[in-house]
């Protein structure tokens, strides 16, 4: 059974305001309900070195925001971030330093740690992306079951009842999601694991693996 604790999936980003929150809970899904309030508290206190481009949107230094991008607060975007044309940030979002949010990518109630890339046509809702995580073009982190029931995380025979209706995915550090893949609600991708294009993922995938298909997982050499 794979370990799914916050400290099992993520390492410190070196960005204090992100690390303080991410490592405040034992499990990553426990973070989702407090993201909005945490961002609001940071904005109210003020963050040195950040510019306020809207009453509830802060951006860091050397960050570029395309004119056609849409950003709804509360949102904090770090340093050296690129938000490209057509990006849609729906609020309750933290985008860590050196990250990319690309054309037609939509983020909602999510944290991207350091150097994350969601560059083309991605949906990232109610999710946490670790350092250097990458979502290939058209990959979707689905956050709502078709029956609207609370999300259950399936971990090698153990079913973890979260009691939460909306959960996307938790991508650990250096997780790489192939183009056109769909991650079902509650999917966890371990550190340094690669998902092949057009794969449907459900459950927990171990670190240092290659996911070639829904039921084909091999250890990296």
Located regions from the model:
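ABC ATPase A-loop
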Residues: 58, 76, 94, 170, ...
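Terminal amphipathic alpha-helical/low-complexity segments used for targeting or macromolecular assembly
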Residues: 1-56, 61, 192, 198, ...
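Surface-exposed loop/turn and secondary-structure junction residues enriched for glycine/proline
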Residues: 12-13, 25, 56, 62, ...
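Glycine-rich hexapeptide-repeat left-handed beta-helix
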Residues: 18-19, 103, 112-114, 119-221
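Glycine-rich active-site/cofactor-binding loop and its immediate structural neighborhood
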Residues: 61, 65-104
């Amino acid at each position: 059974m794979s370990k799914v604790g916050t400290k099992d999936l993520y390492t410190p980003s070196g960005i204090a305001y992100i690390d303080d929150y991410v490592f405040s809970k034992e499990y990553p899904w426990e973070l989702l309900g407090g993201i909005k309030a945490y961002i609001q508290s940071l904005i109210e206190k003020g963050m040195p070195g950040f510019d306020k481009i809207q009453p509830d949107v802060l951006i860091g230094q050397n960050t570029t925001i395309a004119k056609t991008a849409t950003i709804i607060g509360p949102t904090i975007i770090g340093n050296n971030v690129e938000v490209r044309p057509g990006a849609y940030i729906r609020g309750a979002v933290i985008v860590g330093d050196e990250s990319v949010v690309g054309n037609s990518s939509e983020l909602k109630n999510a944290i991207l740690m350091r150097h994350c890339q969601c560059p083309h046509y991605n949906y990232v809702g109610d999710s946490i992306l670790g350092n250097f995580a990458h979502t290939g073009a058209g990959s979707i982190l689905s956050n709502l079951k078709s029956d609207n029931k609370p999300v259950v995380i399936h971990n090698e025979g153990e079913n973890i009842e979260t009691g939460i209706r909306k959960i996307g995915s938790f991508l650990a550090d250096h997780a790489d999601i192939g183009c056109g893949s769909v991650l079902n609600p509650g999917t966890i991708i371990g550190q340094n694991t690669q998902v092949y294009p057009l794969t449907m993922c459900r459950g927990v995938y171990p670190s240092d693996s290659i996911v070639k298909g829904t039921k084909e997982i091999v250890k990296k050499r």
